[in-house]
Amino acid sequence: MLERLKAITNLLKGALEQRSRAEEGYIREEKVKEAIELLEALERDIMEKELKLAKEALEKFDSNRKFYYLVGKLYVEVSKEEAQKLIEDELKMFGGEGK
């Protein structure tokens, strides 16, 4: 993840360092597009990491506890099994593995 942040920083610095006015707009637009792609990939990486951590934490709790899952802006009470399935489904959405 740190490598992606460094790449974004360097990309944006490079876009600002362009000298030619004719090329400046086009080059900056391309650099911004590249930066957006890197940021989106970083966002997926972070989300996948958070989901994996949640999955690991969930496995440490017994089924007698109450579990809550954030759905939109609501926390919904779910069973341990439901929480595990929801996390696995989200991991698949972000390109991670469910198990």
From Swiss-Prot:
Keywords assigned by UniProt, alphabetized: Coiled coil
Keyword flag DNA repair: no
Coiled coil: 3-68
One GO term describing the cellular component: prefoldin complex
Listed InterPro entries: PFD_beta-like, Prefoldin
GO biological process per UniProt: protein folding
GO molecular function annotation: unfolded protein binding
Pfam family of the protein (one): Prefoldin_2
Protein name, per record: Uncharacterized protein aq_754
Organism: Aquifex aeolicus (strain VF5)
